[in-house]
Amino acid sequence: MSQFGSREPGLVGAALELHNLSAGIIADGFHVDVSTIKVALRAKKTPGSIFLVSDSMATTGTNLKSFELNGRKIFRKNGRLTLENGTLAGADLDLATSVRFMVHEVGIPYIDALKMATIFPSRFIGMEKEIGVLLPGARADFLWLDESLNVRRVWRSGEALI
């Protein structure tokens, strides 16, 4: 993605400046710094214009320390996925971790962080009546988070998984 610069605002600048444009943020402190997230939230005041995405690999939640992808070795350490040279190679977080990050590191209210992971992205893709909500006729995908925002239980289509 193009970087934000004083002479060339790039994609980030366009996302922040255009009020009718929504943007997803990987809230892990590696892809986007806490200060940058705060600036983005101040710039995009319309509810739902910033939402959480994970960019996570299938290894998220496993004990794997490394894996191969397209012939390249990916290393996992301290919440980061990197190439051998240290270049960021993807995210190693689920959305519950992003919600915790937004609450504890960025300092936004719990309910706002939950909306950024649920209803806001479902509205963005036009599925707000099916996913990201608990309404009659919706899929009934939801989770139970404890007071520390850790996942305690998961339901998909109304069926308990864990």
Roles of regions detected by a PLM:
Residues A117-T118, A138:
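A general structural motif at alpha-helix termini
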Residues M1-D112, A117, R123-E128, L145-N150:
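Active-site-adjacent C-terminal substructures of enzyme catalytic domains
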Residues R123, V133-I162:
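C-terminal cap of metal-dependent C-N hydrolases
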